[in-house]
């Protein structure tokens, strides 16, 4: 969809520098082949996530293991210091999303109260609020291959869905990844209208091991 709009995608292309140019700005990158390439544009949007707001906490003095200020926790949201828990954007290696922090908070609170609970990352969806919307939960094909999982894929084009056509949103698809033998849902990926709402069904299927 975005390629049709004239957008160009360059993945695995780390930025080396951003410089002023007659057009506006020039971004210098290194591509997968190790070659230096550059792109010019009027504006550059930098979207690299948030920096953990932990500088004032003196993590080292508290003995908390961290990676550049992001606190390392286990699946119970507990740090290496017994009784100390961390959740949200200050946690290392987790998605910086509000619903992710909420799920972490529930797990931490239950463990603090003595109720065993673990954070299940695979049932926590990721949503991209754009046009068209995109959403994902569970494993991708690449992750299944890396884990050696025998899987199968089902795809449904939204152009075949009446409700999508009614709202002029026929462009998009739903992709489901399932275990090849037992047909348990391993992942769901959607692009199209209301994808960020529909992904909840995929998260439910994963949580119920359907």
Q: PLM features: residue spans?
A:
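A conserved short coil-to-beta-strand element within the FAD-binding core of flavoproteins
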Residues: 11-23
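Conserved beta-strand-loop-beta-strand element in the redox core of flavoprotein oxidoreductases
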Residues: 20-38, 44
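A short alpha-helix-loop-beta-strand transition element characteristic
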Residues: 65-68, 115-125, 149-154
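Flexible, glycine-rich terminal cap/loop adjacent to redox cofactors
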Residues: 113, 130-210
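FAD-site-proximal beta/loop scaffold in flavoenzymes
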Residues: 9, 38-113
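Helical element adjacent to the flavin cofactor pocket in flavoenzyme catalytic cores
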Residues: 1-9
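Short, acidic, Ser/Thr-enriched surface-loop or helix-capping motifs
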Residues: 31, 74-75, 179-180
């Amino acid at each position: 969809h975005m390629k049709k709009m004239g957008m160009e995608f360059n993945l695995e292309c780390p930025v080396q520098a951003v410089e002023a140019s007659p057009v506006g700005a020039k971004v210098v990158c290194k591509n997968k082949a190790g070659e230096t390439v550059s792109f010019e544009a009027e504006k550059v949007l930098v979207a690299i996530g948030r920096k953990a707001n932990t500088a004032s906490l003196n993590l080292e003095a508290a003995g908390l293991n961290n990676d550049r200020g992001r606190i390392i926790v286990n699946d119970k949201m507990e740090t290496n210091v017994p009784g100390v828990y961390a959740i949200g954007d200050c946690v290392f290696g987790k998605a910086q999303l509000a619903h992710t922090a909420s799920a972490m908070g529930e797990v931490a609170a239950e463990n603090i109260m003595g109720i065993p609970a673990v954070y299940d990352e695979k049932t926590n969806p990721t949503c991209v609020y754009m046009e068209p919307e995109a959403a994902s939960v569970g494993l991708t094909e690449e992750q299944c291959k890396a884990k050696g999982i025998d899987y199968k894929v089902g795809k449904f084009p939204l152009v075949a869905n009446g409700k999508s056509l009614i709202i002029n949103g026929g462009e998009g698809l739903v992709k489901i990844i399932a275990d090849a033998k037992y047909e348990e849902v391993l992942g769901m990926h959607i692009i199209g209208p209301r994808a960020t709402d529909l992904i909840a069904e995929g998260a439910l299927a994963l949580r119920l091991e359907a």
